[in-house]
Amino acid sequence: MPRPFQIRKVTRLPKCKSFKPVGVPRKVLEQAILALDEYEAIRLADYLKLEHLEAAEKMGISRPTFTRLIERARTKLASAIIEAKELVIEGGHIDLQSTRLRCSDCGEEQQAEPSESSQNCPECGSENVEDMKLFFTGAKHGRQRRRRGRA
């Protein structure tokens, strides 16, 4: 019997959801989907230059699992660059350690702890503030899987 899937800890969400080649219409592009845990692995190992063991501890997974995760992420990145695909960062089974809120009116973004309940924009005072986790996990804006007979 396989081990149960371990939810991965993600410290920071990306600043944007997708990257695409310039001059190619989005409708003709294939997509390479990079899950949020794969993005976090790239951020920790390649951007912050952490050793695999330290990065694995931050994500709450074993070192061998982290190594497989980073290899899968690098393969997807290489595929997106070499084959001119749109790179979309979304989804995955994650435990977000902090969250980012964005004002729908003025576009102001702020980091917040998940327990903070302030839903007003500090810049314009608007109440139209959305949790970016919903944006990246597909719960609000992304692709949602439809099942037969259910919406």
Curated annotation (Swiss-Prot):
Source domain of life: Bacteria
SUPFAM superfamilies: Sigma3 and sigma4 domains of RNA polymerase sigma factors
InterPro entries found in the cross-reference section: RNA_pol_sigma_r3/r4-like, UPF0251, WH-like_DNA-bd_sf
Residue stretches in coiled coil: none
Pfam families (alphabetical): DUF134 (PF02001)
Entry's family note: Belongs to the UPF0251 family.
PANTHER family: PTHR37478, UPF0251 PROTEIN TK0562
Protein name, as recorded: UPF0251 protein Ctha_0452
Taxonomy of the source species: Bacteria, Pseudomonadati, Chlorobiota, Chlorobiia, Chlorobiales
